[in-house]
C-alpha cells in the first residue's frame, strides 16, 4: 500500500474536498473508507483516511499500484490549499495480520497489547525500535484483523517474527478471493477511472451534502440512475467466470462484462461480479 501524509492549516478542508466521505467531526484515532474522484465521477482511487492525533494531520493509504498516479493527482489538487503533501511510500510499508487469531497473534507474538481494545476502523500509535508504528483494526479480507504501518526496516523484522511464530504467509491471490467473497471492490476491477462509486454500488461512502470533486455527477447519478451497475451473479454449473468474460442476455446479446470471478470456497459455487447495462 501507499502512505501519503497531508498536514497544514488547510489539511482538513483539503482532504474533505478530495475525499467522497465526510471527515469533519471525525475524531483522531478513527479511520474512514472512501474514494477520490475526477470531476466526471470516475474514481482516481479508493483509500483509507486516518485522522492523526496531531491537529490537521492525516494519513492517506492508497493502493500500491496507484501510488505515483495518486500522489501526482493529490499534489495537483493541493495547489490552492495551505497544505504539505508527503509521499512516504518508499520508506513505509504495511503488513496485514488477518483472521480469527489475528488479535491473539498481535498480542502474543508482537506484544501490541493495546490492540485488543481497538474497535473496527480505529487505530493507535505505537513504537517499534524507537520509531513510529500505526496499528489499525482494519483489513480487506472480511475477517477480523490488523494492519501495521511502519518503516521498511521494521516491517522486515515484524514479518520475520510472524513467520517464526508459525503465522502463514498469504499473497494477493488469497487476499483477492477473501475480499471478493466479502463483497469488497478492487480498484481496476470494480472501480476505475471509467466506473463511478454510484455505478459500483458504493454510494453510501459518498456524502452528497458536502462539496467534493465529482460530487455533482454522483448526485445526478443517484437521482436519475446510471446506464450500468455492478451486480453479483451465481453460476449454475461448475464453470468459473473470469474477468473480462462477456455477460449475455437470454437472446445472446452482450449486456455486460465480468469484473471478478472465482469458485467460492465458502459457498462451494462459482460466483462473479459483473458490470451490466441497466
Model-derived segments and spans:
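Conserved, structured C-terminal
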Residues: 53-278
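Charged, low-complexity, helix/coiled-coil-prone segments
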Residues: 8-21, 44-52, 96-107, 189
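Well-ordered mid-protein domain cores that form the structural environment of catalytic cofactors
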Residues: 22-77
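Acidic, proline/glycine-enriched N-terminal capping motif
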Residues: 1-36, 42, 173
Amino acid at each position: 500500500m501507499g502512505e501519503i501524509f497531508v498536514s497544514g492549516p488547510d489539511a482538513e478542508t483539503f482532504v474533505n474536498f478530495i475525499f467522497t466521505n465526510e471527515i469533519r467531526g471525525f475524531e483522531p484515532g478513527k479511520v474512514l473508507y472512501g474514494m477520490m474522484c475526477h470531476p466526471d465521477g470516475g474514481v482516481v482511487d479508493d483509500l483509507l483516511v486516518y485522522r492523526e492525533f496531531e491537529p490537521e494531520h492525516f494519513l492517506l493509504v492508497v493502493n500500491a499500484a496507484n501510488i505515483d498516479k495518486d500522489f501526482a493527482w493529490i499534489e495537483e489538487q493541493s495547489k490552492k490549499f495551505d497544505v504539505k503533501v508527503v509521499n512516504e511510500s518508499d520508506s513505509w510499508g504495511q503488513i496485514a495480520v488477518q483472521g480469527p487469531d489475528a488479535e491473539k497473534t498481535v498480542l502474543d507474538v508482537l506484544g501490541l497489547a493495546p490492540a485488543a481494545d481497538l474497535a473496527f476502523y480505529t487505530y493507535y500509535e505505537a513504537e517499534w525500535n524507537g520509531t513510529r508504528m500505526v496499528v489499525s483494526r482494519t483489513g480487506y479480507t472480511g475477517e477480523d484483523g490488523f494492519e501495521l504501518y511502519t518503516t521498511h526496516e521494521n516491517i522486515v523484522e515484524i514479518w520475520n517474527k510472524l513467520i517464526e511464530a508459525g503465522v502463514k504467509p498469504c499473497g494477493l491471490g488469497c487476499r483477492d478471493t477473501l475480499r471478493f467473497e466479502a463483497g469488497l471492490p478492487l480498484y481496476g476491477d470494480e472501480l476505475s477511472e471509467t466506473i463511478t462509486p454510484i455505478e459500483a454500488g458504493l454510494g453510501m461512502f459518498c456524502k452528497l451534502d458536502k462539496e467534493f470533486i465529482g460530487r455533482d455527477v454522483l448526485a445526478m447519478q443517484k437521482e436519475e440512475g446510471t446506464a450500468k451497475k455492478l451486480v453479483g451473479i451465481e453460476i449454475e454449473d461448475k464453470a468459473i467466470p473470469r474477468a473480462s468474460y462477456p455477460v449475455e442476455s437470454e437472446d445472446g446479446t452482450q449486456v455486460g462484462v465480468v469484473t471478478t470471478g472465482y469458485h467460492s470456497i465458502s459457498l462451494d459455487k462459482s460466483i462473479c461480479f459483473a458490470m451490466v447495462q441497466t
